Amino acid sequence: MSGIRFDRLRVLVVDDNQHMRKLVVTILQAFGCTQIIEAVDGEHAWSLLPDVNPDVILLDWQMSGMTGLEFVKKLRTDEKTPNPFVPVIMLTGHTHVDHVRMARDAGANEFLAKPVSVKAVMSRLLAVIEHPRPFVRANTYFGPCRRRRVSDEYKGPERRNSDEIVALDDLGQKK
């Protein structure tokens, strides 16, 4: 396993299904996470953000009230958000490519299909911690860079202003 101190990681788990929430919490505890905060829905999670200041959020897509998708959009764009850069791992049973795109376009860092496995949770958690994506601000989007592939063969002009890309450290804080 990696050298990450999971005991120092503060994780917010948001799911309106108590059984799924407990499963994710149990998996995180098995990794050594001790600072786990649970929220029963998007509104509850939003109310906790100022006091909790999580390093990572694991969030269900389909919840009553504020959905996971609505939560991520609000997290990334609302002027009252305490940390728009916090990494978000979206959990869902909807794995069609359109759902993956919607989560990505809302600002989710990673996508995790239900039912979750220990290996899949670890993989996504390591992805957001060890390989954080730079954040991009565009006219209609703010969130982690959506590019997954880097091409050494691209010869055209860089279309992004480097001043608009923000690097994060291993716990999602601005560098």
How should each PLM-predicted stretch be described?
Residues 38-47, 68:
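Helix N-cap/capping motif at the beta->alpha junctions
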Residues 25, 70, 84, 95-110, ...:
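Alpha4 helix (beta4-alpha4-beta5 surface) of REC/receiver domains from two-component response regulators
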Residues 18-37:
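Two-component/phosphorelay signaling modules centered on CheY-like receiver
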Residues 63:
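Receiver (REC) domain active-site loop signature in two-component systems and cognate sites
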Residues 130-175:
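CheY-like receiver
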Residues 116-129, 133, 137-138:
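C-terminal output helix
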